[in-house]
Design a protein with these regions (language model features):
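A short beta-strand element within the Helicase C-terminal
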Residues: 261-262, 268-283, 289, 306-310
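Conserved SF2 helicase motif VI
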Residues: 286-302
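Long, largely alpha-helical accessory region at the distal end of helicase-like NTP-driven motors
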Residues: 173-189, 318-370
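Conserved helicase ATPase core of P-loop NTP-dependent helicases/translocases
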Residues: 231-263
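SF2 helicase catalytic motif II
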Residues: 58-96
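Conserved segment of the helicase C-terminal RecA-like domain
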Residues: 297-323
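Interdomain helical connector at the RecA1-RecA2 junction of SF1/SF2 helicase-like NTPases
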Residues: 106-202, 216
Length: 370
């Protein structure tokens, strides 16, 4: 874990000054809890605080600069401050930590090349960690929670076709798709069937505050067959109450279902032990965020099988699982001793696809509509 790396470095160099930079105070507060030791030679600072106090960079004098979640240093304003710091202390040793060195939505920028001249000491993908049995193999449930807009968009595309024969053919497929979606079990039944630990802890990822509020309103219906009175916690990224809610969620050992609704504060850097699963309520996202959210359900040494509910509101998002599948297939080739000769992705990753019938019809429509 990142906290172990920090602790080892600081213990080995007690007389050196460490400057630890991270995207938010929540991240280093959690890392402090994991370290469980007080060190007087570490100075903690968020990237935004460094940016606001650029004028005091010449007073910092670090021997070691730790860049936590260093892919975030590619952001234009934060990046300027970090570069100014690195230029001011060229002899300071640098340590960067991140789930990925690539900024997927920023022209695939490689921040390991930009900040560390490509020096990567250790790299392990989520898929590799699962294949090598460092992390547990999850149960993965795919379902849709909203499809009205998707059907409307498909209808418009069909109406825009010039060939009447194609219009008629695709309208029939659209009707089949609508029927398949209507006949599929609703989320109330999906959760009742797949959420086998009614007193478990689950992190619910939403795309924004408005989206989170909408999704919380659905909780009474969606989880009614699991627990009629779930404990619901809310984590807004920049609010003081977030720390309190987050701490209460971690401490809750009661007999009720526990749901922590959050936006982005748990995408990176912050870990919660004994989480039984994650619920991804998401539009299409970058691979890094998708894998980080899945990673929140998996903890090394866990004795239980976590469950991932991948709930999407558009068909394109149903294919995000492919990026994890590719990582695992590569790991099977790189580490043949960790599995039997005939073993592959489907043997180690249990997928329950509640969208199978509708997805097949959608693929036919996509091919027809180009």
């Amino acid at each position: 874990a990142a906290s172990d790396v920090y602790k080892r470095q600081v213990e080995q160099h007690p007389h050196k000054h460490f400057l630890w930079l991270s995207p938010s105070e929540y991240i280093y507060k959690t890392q402090l809890e994991n370290i469980d030791t007080q060190f007087s030679n570490i100075e903690y600072m968020s990237y935004s605080r460094l940016m606001k106090h650029e004028d005091s960079i010449d007073t910092l004098h670090p021997d070691y600069i730790i860049l936590d979640e260093f892919h975030r240093c590619g952001a234009s304003e934060w990046g300027k401050s970090v570069r100014k710091l690195l230029e001011a202390y060229p002899n300071a040793k640098r340590l960067g930590l991140s789930a990925t060195n690539i900024r997927y939505l920023d022209n695939q920028r490689n921040m390991a090349e930009e900040l560390f001249e490509g020096n990567i000491a250790s790299e392990m993908t989520l898929g590799e960690a699962i294949v090598r049995k460092i992390l547990p193999e999850p149960k993965y449930v795919i379902a849709m929670y909203s499809y009205k807009k998707e059907l409307e968009q498909l209808k418009k595309r069909i109406e825009g076709l010039s060939n009447q024969g194609l219009v008629s053919e695709n309208e029939k497929l659209l009707e089949l798709l609508k029927r398949a979606l209507e006949q599929a079990d609703g989320l109330t039944e999906v959760f009742a069937r797949q959420m086998t630990k009614p007193d478990g802890k689950y992190i619910v990822f939403c795309s924004g505050r408005e989206h989170m509020d909408e999704m919380k309103e659905q909780a009474g219906d969606w989880f009614s067959k699991v627990d009629k009175k779930p404990h619901i916690y809310t984590a807004y990224y920049n609010e003081a109450s977030t720390s309190k809610a987050f701490a209460e969620f971690k401490k809750d050992t009661g007999s009720h279902l526990k749901l922590l609704y959050c936006i982005d504060m748990l995408n990176e850097g912050i870990h919660v032990d004994d989480v039984d699963g994650v619920i991804l309520l998401r539009p299409t996202v970058s691979p890094i965020i998708y894998l980080q959210q899945i990673g929140r359900a998996l903890s090394a040494g866990s004795k239980t099988q976590p469950v991932i509910f991948d709930l999407v509101n558009n068909f394109d998002s149903l294919y995000c699982i492919d990026c994890l599948k590719n990582e695992m297939q590569e790991a099977f080739l790189l580490y043949p001793d960790t599995h039997s000769k005939r073993e592959h992705f489907d043997d180690r990753f249990r997928i329950i696809d509640e969208t199978k019938d509708s997805r097949e019809i959608f693929m036919c429509l996509q091919e027809n509509l180009g």
